[in-house]
UniProtKB/Swiss-Prot annotation:
Tissue and organ expression note: Expressed in flower buds and flowers.
One Pfam family in the UniProt entry: WD40
GO molecular function: actin filament binding
Function as written in the Swiss-Prot or TrEMBL entry: Binds actin. Enhances the F-actin depolymerization activity of actin-depolymerizing factor (ADF) proteins.
Record keyword Repeat present: yes
Gene assigned in the entry: AIP1-1
SMART domains given in the database record: WD40
Gene3D superfamilies: YVTN repeat-like/Quinoprotein amine dehydrogenase (2.130.10.10)
Gene Ontology BP, a term: actin filament depolymerization
Record protein name field: Actin-interacting protein 1-1
Assigned keywords, A-Z: Actin-binding, Repeat, WD repeat
Lineage, uppermost ranks: Eukaryota, Viridiplantae, Streptophyta, Embryophyta, Tracheophyta
PROSITE patterns: WD_REPEATS_1, WD_REPEATS_2, WD_REPEATS_REGION
Placement of WD repeats on the sequence: 3-43, 55-94, 98-142, 143-183, 186-225, 231-270, 282-319, 323-363, 446-485, 491-530, 534-573, 578-611
Organism, as annotated: Arabidopsis thaliana
Length: 611
């Protein structure tokens, strides 16, 4: 049996020039955010407590708790809203197609019976309010001419709805049934976010014109604005009220977050605190989302980093939560410290995770796309979609300065002889391999066939190269760093995708694009375990347990399968739906724990119980 131990989640999806709208539930102290086709439910009391909902067919844009916390409404780029339970396996209550295009925001009414959604209507309705159980429309929302970026339900009687969008307008509706009441054009650029105060007396809008406007919650009349003296110098993307309705938190493209004191009558808002951040100096420091929930002030940067401040002590350094935004392509576990996991994503981000803790630190490689990662205790090697192989030293505080070498070809696979004195690296390309000592090219060898995968033995004395034709070519590595072919093995019916040696070097395993894996005896060159055909699609990754007894495979069919070498393949252990969109990498942490990563940009740890 495979049991999920931990999830190291991705961070919210972000888009430059647009804000994101995160939300939460004050009773359970959990937050909701979206990435890809998944909604992530994350506890602020226990940060390792993460749940994932992945039933949308398209990228999810927004998710909100119902007032009683029992239901969640989430929406996607197709205009679909799904209402599902927070308990008992996320049971689906209803699904409605509410807009013709992307939903940018949605809100529940305070009684939990109605939902309003806004976004891109593609020439049709831009805002719609409907009953949560039947989907019946509750009114007409005229007045907007372009995409409606945000909407808000008044949290007290009488019912009111306020909206804002790309036409620079703030519109106000009363009902139900809802009908147009008034419109305001105080803003001179996109109005990015609109939020009612918890007591319902006011609502506030923030805009790319660097301004915030305050309106009466019942009549919709403008009553004040945020003072500009100490205000933001860039577009304001999001705003969130304090639980007592006296203060607001705003975030901006100027890389700052500010806390404002709002007068009781709403006539003015004044900055009382500008929150401090550690900046990397790049555009990823721009702040695009925020949430004030209980004692937590949460900000989200363009790079996805979530900073958690305490409302009681805003001078206290924030707790940082980070991770990947894009799909995780490769994993490595540091040998002597098997609680440390390294992961990389194709957008150039390398993240260090600690088992039982989660996020530790990260390194953003500028202008580099990463496809493969291999590691020793002292350094990591990465390769991407150009001709470069990078070496990055590992330090106590994170990472050292990166260096690279141009091998003249796009790398396909990379492996390191971790037990050899020189820590030789083998890098394969489309027609051959390169042997590296650090960043020194020892030899470049054209093998005369189409290469698909490769590996070098931990002692550096042997290499195996797999071809597009499914053949395994075994080479001895000579003292002059040349390769001598010793054998050719034929069993696979598809191009090789991955080859790995067992830790004790008595076996090796291979996987192919035709969903088959094979375990081989290294000495006899005979098949030791076959019929490993239980994936339904291409195998992307393969790993051995430290005790040499198990092999794990990951596939684009979303499953991780673990085979026991001394048992028939039919007695496999399967983690189904391990990663939405497919599994890209697997690695053993210890004899009974497997790490996996995939298209959902997350890393998961699984406890494996042998049959």
């Amino acid at each position: 049996m495979a049991k999920l131990l931990e999830t190291f989640p991705c961070v919210p999806s972000t888009e430059r020039g647009r804000g994101i709208l995160i939300s939460g539930d004050s009773k359970s102290d959990t937050i909701l955010y979206c990435n890809g086709r998944s909604v992530f439910i994350r506890s602020l009391r226990q940060l390792q407590d993460v749940q994932v909902y992945g039933e949308h067919g398209y990228a999810v844009t927004v998710a909100r708790y119902s007032p009683n916390g029992e239901w969640i409404a989430s929406a996607d780029v197709s205009g679909t809203v799904r209402v599902w339970g927070t308990h008992n396996g996320f049971v689906l209550k209803n699904e409605f197609r509410v807009l013709a295009g992307r939903v940018d925001d949605l809100q529940w009414s305070f009684d939990g019976l109605r939902i309003v959604a806004s976004g891109d209507g593609k020439g049709k309705s831009l805002v719609r309010s409907f009953a949560w159980d039947s989907g019946n429309t509750m009114g007409d929302f005229d007045g907007h001419s372009r995409r409606v970026l945000s909407c808000a339900f008044k949290p007290t009687r009488p019912f009111r709805i306020a909206t804002c969008g790309e036409d620079f307008l703030v519109n106000f509706y009363d009902g139900p049934p809802f009908k147009f009441h008034s419109s305001h054009r105080e803003h001179s650029n996109f109005v990015n976010c609109i939020r009612y105060s918890p007591d319902g007396t006011k609502f506030i809008t923030v805009s790319s014109d660097k301004k915030g406007m305050i309106y009466d919650g019942k009549t919709g009349d403008k009553v004040g604005e945020l003072a500009s003296e100490d205000g933001h110098k860039g577009s304001i993307y999001a705003v969130s009220w304090s639980p007592d309705s006296k203060r607001v938190l705003t975030v901006s493209a100027d890389k700052s977050a500010k806390v404002w004191e709002v007068a009781e009558d709403g006539t003015i808002g004044s900055v009382i605190k500008t929150l401090s951040f550690m900046e990397s100096g790049g555009a990823e420091d721009m702040l695009v989302g925020c949430l004030w929930q209980n004692d937590h002030l949460i900000t989200v940067s363009l790079g996805g980093t979530m900073s958690l401040f305490s409302a009681d002590d805003m001078d206290k350094p924030p707790l940082l939560l980070s991770g990947h935004i894009k799909n995780v392509t490769s994993l490595a576990v540091l040998g002597e410290n098997q609680k440390t996991i390294l992961s990389c994503s194709y957008d150039g981000l390398i993240v260090k995770w600690l088992k039982g803790v989660g996020y530790s630190c990260k390194l953003q490689m500028k202008d580099t796309k990463i496809k493969r990662l291999a590691a020793t205790e002292s350094s990591i090697f990465i390769s991407g979609y150009d001709n470069m192989v990078w070496r990055i030293p590992l330090t106590d505080n994170g990472y050292g300065a990166a260096e690279h070498v141009d091998i003249g070809h796009q790398p396909l696979d990379i492996s390191i002889a971790v037990d050899s004195p020189e820590a030789t690296a083998l890098v394969s390309f489309d027609s051959g391999v390169v042997l590296l000592n650090g960043l020194n090219i020892l030899s470049k060898i054209d093998l005369g066939f189409a290469v698909a995968a490769s590996v070098i033995s931990p002692d550096g004395k042997e290499a195996i190269v797999g071809g597009q034709d499914g053949k395994l070519h075994i080479y001895s590595v000579s003292g002059d760093n040349n390769l001598k072919e010793e054998a050719v093995l034929e069993k696979h019916r598809g191009a090789l995708t991955v080859i790995r040696y067992s830790p004790d070097l008595t076996m090796f395993a291979s996987g192919d694009a035709n969903r088959e894996a094979v375990v081989w005896d290294r000495e006899t060159k005979q098949v030791k375990l076959n019929n490993m055909l239980f994936h339904t699609a291409r195998i992307n990754s393969l790993a051995w347990s430290p005790n040499n007894k198990m092999v794990a495979t990951g596939s684009i069919d979303t499953c991780v399968i673990v085979y026991e070498v001394d048992k028939p393949a039919s007695s496999r252990i399967t983690a189904r739906n391990a990663h939405l969109g497919g599994v890209n990498a697997v690695a053993f942490i210890d004899d009974c724990t497997v790490a996996s990563s995939g298209e959902d940009a997350s890393v998961r740890l699984w406890h494996i119980e042998p049959q």
